[in-house]
């Protein structure tokens, strides 16, 4: 099994807010992330969702929607030169979102949805499939294979190098631990890395689903601890949601890190990787 650290050309860093709140808010976060984006040791992507389609409550803020959201992400791309990640929830969104996004992400709840995986894989974007909280990490190989066979029908089995070449990644974001809690089984990083590059989502891994009366809560203080552990195990990159004012974020504020906290964490993770 692969136990060494980064296999991708550079460690990947995916950072940004959970959901697009406004263009002004995106800019304020993007500016704060410039030191990380300019770090030549990192392959940086700015992330934000145009629609949070799986919010706990109907009343919760979802985002500006596909058209307006992509316009704002394109503005960030043009103004800052950042590569972009966004997630899609329905097949028809894939080809449109791929005109802006360099990575299209499949949400954890939808990680087995064949039509969605196929639609995303038919674009030129990197495919980042989040492991469902309910999934055996070994079974994520079948989601990877759906994407790989869409891109190259001759592929018969998933493997790390094949997935890397074809731009198919997996993302660990914790597993259900009873009701309203998640736990990270670090073995899953090594298991999934047998058949794809693996990104560790440090902030959603500390989420407490549905733990705040109609919305999810969490404890961001544990995110750096889990991220440093993941770096020691061996991963290809870090996913971390960040906000200049997490307490007033419109989604997942309890899990988010401030940009300066993320910068310190990434410094620690790079030091850990250098030990191996």
Curated annotation (Swiss-Prot):
**Which keywords accompany this UniProt record?**
Cytoplasm, Lipopolysaccharide biosynthesis, Transferase
One GO MF term on file is:
3-deoxy-8-phosphooctulonate synthase activity
Q: Which Gene3D superfamilies match?
A: Aldolase class I
Q: Where in the cell is it found?
A: Cytoplasm
Describe which pathway this protein belongs to, using the record's wording: Carbohydrate biosynthesis; 3-deoxy-D-manno-octulosonate biosynthesis; 3-deoxy-D-manno-octulosonate from D-ribulose 5-phosphate: step 2/3; Bacterial outer membrane biogenesis; lipopolysaccharide biosynthesis
By sequence similarity, the record places it as follows: Belongs to the KdsA family.
Task: Please report the name of this protein according to its UniProt entry.
Answer: 2-dehydro-3-deoxyphosphooctonate aldolase
| Species in which this protein is naturally found | Helicobacter pylori (strain P12)
Write the lineage as a comma-separated list. Answer: Bacteria, Pseudomonadati, Campylobacterota, Epsilonproteobacteria, Campylobacterales
């Amino acid at each position: 099994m692969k136990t060494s650290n980064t296999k991708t050309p550079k460690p990947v860093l995916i950072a940004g807010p959970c959901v697009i709140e406004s263009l002004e808010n995106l800019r304020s976060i993007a500016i704060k992330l410039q030191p990380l984006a300019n770090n030549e040791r990192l392959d940086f992507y700015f992330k934000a969702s145009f629609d949070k389609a799986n919010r706990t409550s109907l009343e919760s803020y979802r985002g500006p929607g596909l058209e307006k959201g992509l316009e704002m992400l394109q503005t960030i791309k043009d103004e800052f030169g950042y590569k972009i990640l966004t997630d899609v929830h329905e097949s028809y969104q894939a080809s449109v979102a791929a005109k802006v996004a360099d990575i299209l992400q499949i949400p954890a709840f939808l990680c087995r949805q064949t039509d969605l995986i196929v639609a995303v894989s038919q674009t030129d974007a990197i495919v980042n499939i989040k492991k469902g909280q309910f999934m055996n990490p070994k079974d994520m190989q079948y989601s990877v294979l759906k994407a790989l066979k869409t891109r190259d029908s001759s592929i018969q089995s998933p493997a790390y190098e094949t997935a890397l070449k074809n731009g198919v990644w997996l993302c660990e974001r914790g597993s259900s631990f009873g009701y309203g809690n998640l736990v990270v089984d670090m073995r899953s990083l090594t298991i999934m890395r047998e058949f794809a590059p693996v990104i560790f989502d440090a902030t959603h891994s500390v989420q407490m689903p549905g733990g705040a009366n109609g919305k999810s809560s969490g404890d961001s203080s544990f995110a750096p601890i889990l991220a440093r552990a993941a770096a020691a195990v061996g991963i290809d990159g870090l996913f971390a949601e960040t906000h200049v004012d997490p307490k007033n974020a419109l989604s997942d504020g309890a899990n988010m890190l401030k940009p300066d906290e993320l910068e310190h964490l990434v410094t620690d993770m790079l030091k850990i990787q250098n030990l191996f």
